Curated annotation (Swiss-Prot):
Protein source organism: Archaeoglobus fulgidus (strain ATCC 49558 / DSM 4304 / JCM 9628 / NBRC 100126 / VC-16)
Lineage of source species: Archaea, Methanobacteriati, Methanobacteriota, Archaeoglobi, Archaeoglobales
All residue ranges annotated as the AMMECR1 domain in the record: 8-194
PANTHER family documented for this protein: AMME SYNDROME CANDIDATE GENE 1 PROTEIN, AMMECR1 HOMOLOG
Gene3D superfamilies per UniProt: Hypothetical protein ph0010, domain 1, Hypothetical protein ph0010, domain 2
Protein name: Protein AF_1969
Length: 202
């Protein structure tokens, strides 16, 4: 895939996400900060928070509907305080939380017969979105690698993320794929590195 961000830009993205969270937790105000270059372009992005290796929050924008800097700030705050799976993050936790930002390519619908869909999903490269009626679910590319899924399992898990039966990809659901570029802290507040998706589970 085309590199979306340089390593330096990726570091800026992660630092911005952390700053946005901590500013919000301290002031209860959304950080007002603009960056130039790639950050002025519309991009999809997800912010993922982990604490001692466990997921602590993950929310984002699948589609490029906002400037990247705005999308990072909003997704970071939402991952910290609005993920319904978790209690809101406390400021005191931020010394134990690793911040990860995934920059997305625009999702493209996979134009294939349902039974052929797995052949169009490359594990370690593609993330998935499944839509059917009012239901929609998304899994980032790294999820399939972390949980050692094959393409069929990844499709089924994305269906279930949408609140749909696991075989919905065989029964008429729309399936979209996208790619992601991941930057994360090696340790809380530490060095920011680009992550090779294919090594996420190692």
């Amino acid at each position: 895939m085309v590199k979306l961000l340089t390593r330096e830009e990726g570091e800026k993205a992660v630092r911005l996400a952390r700053e946005a969270i901590e500013h919000y937790l301290e002031e209860r105000k959304i950080l007002q900060k603009r960056l130039d270059g790639v950050f002025s372009q519309k991009r999809g992005v997800f912010t993922t928070l982990t604490k001692h290796g466990n997921l602590r929050g993950c929310i984002g924008f699948p589609y490029p509907v906002k400037r990247l800097d705005e999308a990072i700030i909003e997704s970071a705050i939402a991952a910290a305080v609005d993920d319904p799976r978790f209690e809101p993050v406390r400021l005191s936790e931020m010394n134990e939380i690793i911040v990860e930002v995934t920059i997305l390519t625009p999702p493209e619908r996979i134009d294939a017969k349902p039974k052929d869909l797995p052949n169009h999903v490359e594990i370690g490269r593609h993330g998935l979105i499944v839509k059917m009626g009012p239901f929609s679910g998304l899994l980032l590319p790294q999820v399939a690698v972390e949980y050692n899924m094959d393409a069929e399992e990844f499709l089924s898990e994305t269906c279930m993320k949408a609140g749909l039966p696991p075989d919905c990809w065989l029964t008429g659901a729309e399936v979209y794929r996208f790619e992601g570029q991941i930057f994360k802290e090696k340790e809380p507040r530490g060095e920011v590195v680009e992550v090779d998706i294919k090594s996420c589970g190692i």
